[in-house]
Structures are given as C-alpha cells and as structure tokens.
Amino acid sequence: MNIKIKSLLILSLIFVCTFVQAQLTDYSIFDKKFNFYVANDLGRNGYYDQKPIAELMGTMGEEIGPEFVLATGDVHHFEGVRSVNDPLWMTNYELIYSHPELMIDWFPILGNHEYRGNTQAVLDYTNISRRWIMPNRYYTRTFEEKGATIRIIWIDTTPLIEKYRKERDKYPDACKQDVNKQLSWLESVLANAKEDWIIVAGHH
C-alpha cells in the first residue's frame, strides 16, 4: 500500500466552533491525504453559527480538497421534512452549504430528527439534488486512493434504539423498519469486507 490514511477530517459543531476561534490556516497536515468531511446535526435553519461553519468548511475545502461529505444525520431539525419540496431543503441545506467547494457528493444517513418527518422524502431528494446521494436507509460504498482501499458503511441507527421504536406518534417510521434485516446485512458486509480501511458511520 502506497499510503496510510493517517487522519480523517471530522467536523462537528463543537469541533468547528473551537476551530473557528483558533483560526488555524495551516492545512498542510492534510496534504496528499484522502480527506472528507464528517458532519453531524447540521440542520439548524441557519441558526447556531450554521452559516459561518458552512463557510469555514468551504474555505478549508479550497486548501484540502475534500472528496465528499459524510452527513451523519439530522440535516433537518427539529421535525424533519414533509416532502422533497419542503422549504427546509433550502434553509437547512442548499442556501447554507452553497460554497463552490461544497458542491461535491454528499452521502447522508437518517438521524432521529428526520424520523419525526417524512423519511422517504430524504431518500427521494437524491432525485432532486445532484450532490445528495442516498441510495437506501443503509448502504456501503468503496473508495480507492493511491493503492489504499476504503469501505464506508452507512447504518440507520434510529430504528435500532428501543426508545424511538416505542414512540410511534413521534417517530412513526422507526417501528416500521426491519432491524434484524439491517443487522444481518451489516454482519454480512463486515464479514466479506477486504478493504484496508473499514469505517462504519451512524447517527448515534
């Protein structure tokens, strides 16, 4: 293997707020690496410094060249979305993450807040936005960089948690998911994975 991927660039709200204050501008540690963003609990409708953080992601992107964004759920607080035409798609996502460097592939999964709305609409947005790529509630994809192979496995964690399955009025789709089917799929993917790096991503 020609390279070892020594770092993953993980962006969370806490991390980035600290990062903004430090105003680090030397991104050389990310040179010649397979960089991607991991972002969780994104959807704040523009509040809680969401827009400045999105701008920072774009500015950093100019230097480090992220391959994609791994969006690990709750792109839509607090009640999810109602449809692919819900205005929240604009105010939580499109108008916020509008920097040219963020016009890359986004690979999302569902969070518990999406489960309070129309979860199918989150999947169907794949047909609306070129950069929104969500083929299923859980899925896997492989990447290769200079001889190193990486497998990322996206899992749907909300139905795995009893609390959400029991609160049917608040999370109506959670109890409808086949938990055993997902776990069997996950076990099979992990058992057959041959890549150098294996990353499992979930909201919880």
PLM features: residue spans?
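Bacterial N-terminal signal peptides that target proteins for export
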Residues: 1-9
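Bacterial N-terminal signal peptides
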Residues: 9-18
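N-terminal active-site segment of His-dependent metallophosphoesterases
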Residues: 20-87, 175-176, 180
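Extended active-site neighborhood of metal-dependent phosphoesterases/phosphodiesterases
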Residues: 28, 35, 77-198
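Active-site glycine-centered loops adjacent to acidic/histidine catalytic or metal-binding residues
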Residues: 41, 73-74, 111-112, 155, ...
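Generic beta-sheet signal
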Residues: 69, 196-202
